[in-house]
Curated annotation (Swiss-Prot):
It comes from Novosphingobium aromaticivorans (strain ATCC 700278 / DSM 12444 / CCUG 56034 / CIP 105152 / NBRC 16084 / F199). It comes from the Bacteria. The gene is hemE. SUPFAM superfamilies: UROD/MetE-like. This is Uroporphyrinogen decarboxylase. One of its GO terms (cellular component) is cytosol.
């Protein structure tokens, strides 16, 4: 029998509001920091399937969230496509060769780099109760492309946007390649035990409306369609962070089952503008969770009330901050669990 999170993502408006938090497996947890120190680098932790499974389950064990999300990274896809991936202390991820300097067809795919991720999914699934939904995920093509082209994160994605304008056919080939690998990657996660999927388009907010249609909506629609044809029982959550008013078109045109809302969007606007009865996920500001206090309770209740008339998964507007106090997460859970329509 599906748990409350899966029921909600499938379109049921149930009395108990399910909750999980983006980056819930991470540095704010002392048990995570201990294991990370033991394993060394971030990528080593991701590829140690026992350790990655343990990290995925840690927040479930501590807080009893309704969903466990796979501990991994969106850049596993370009790593499998043949780029070298390094996480440097204080600098973030680096990919090479960057596609500003090398042709896409020069990359030699290493599909075996995906297999350990599937093993982690299976190991997590074996540890969860039926009530806890296991979510897999991938980065959406635009966001992944920004790293593949520039070789690292950037503030305004200047290099990637310029390439898309200068040579749209070459950039389309990059988007298409990422899309195809992502479909297979997500399929592997479902086959290993994932019950729902999230597409993270973390940098969608850097695009103008026409480019948003081409580089965000279109490839996400291809992925959602492929997954629904293969696995109609597995809901897909689309999260185009920073989309703003373009979120409404995203929700209507991509075919995702549920849509994630970031903290910059008024929940009352989202409740009014998004398709009726479409499951929504979000959208508490992570800084409120960091700060705690009466304002945390007030704003949490505001989100709960705004989405009371549709299926809603309580979450943050983006990932939990590493300095968030454990007691604030416990307080949030108490508020959400204690609230009733």
């Amino acid at each position: 029998m599906p748990g409350p999170l899966l029921k909600t993502l499938q379109g049921e408006n149930i009395s108990r509001r399910p909750i999980w938090l983006m980056r819930q497996a991470g540095r704010y947890l002392p048990e995570y920091r201990e294991l990370r120190a033991e394993k060394g680098g971030f990528l080593a932790l991701v590829y140690d399937t026992d350790a990655a499974a343990e990290v995925t389950v840690q927040p479930i064990r501590r807080f009893g969230f309704d969903g466990a999300i796979l501990f991994s990274d969106i850049l596993i896809v370009p790593y499998a496509m043949g780029q070298d991936l390094q996480f440097l202390a204080g600098e973030g991820p680096h990919l090479s060769p960057r596609l500003l300097d090398a042709a896409l067809n020069s990359l030699v795919a290493v599909p075996g780099r995906l297999s350990p991720i599937y093993e982690t999914v299976a190991k997590v699934k074996a540890q969860l109760s039926p009530e806890t939904t296991l979510l897999g995920f991938a980065g959406s093509p635009w966001t992944v492309a920004t790293y593949m082209v520039a070789g690292e994160g950037s503030r305004d994605h200047h290099d990637t946007r310029a390439l898309a304008y200068r040579d749209p056919s070459a950039f389309q080939a990059i988007i298409d390649a990422i899309t195809e690998v992502t479909i297979e990657y997500l399929s592997g996660q479902v086959e290993a035990g994932a019950e729902g999927l999230q597409l993270f388009d973390s940098w969608s907010g850097s695009l103008a409306p026409a480019e948003f249609e081409r580089w965000v909506i279109a490839p996400n629609a291809r992925i959602a369609s492929a997954m629904q044809q293969r696995y109609p029982h597995v809901p897909v959550i689309g999260f185009p962070k920073g989309a703003g008013e373009k979120l409404s078109a995203y929700a209507r045109e991509t075919g995702v089952n549920a849509v994630g809302v970031d903290e910059t969007i008024d929940p009352l606007w989202a409740a009014r503008e998004l398709p009726a009865n479409m499951p929504v996920q979000g959208n508490l500001d992570p800084l409120l969770l960091l700060s705690g206090g009466p304002e945390l309770e007030r704003q949490t209740i505001r989100v709960l009330e705004a989405f009371a008339d549709r299926p809603h998964v309580f979450n943050l507007g983006h990932g939990i901050g590493q300095h968030t106090p454990i007691e604030n997460v416990e307080a949030l859970l108490k508020i959400v669990r204690g609230w009733s329509r």
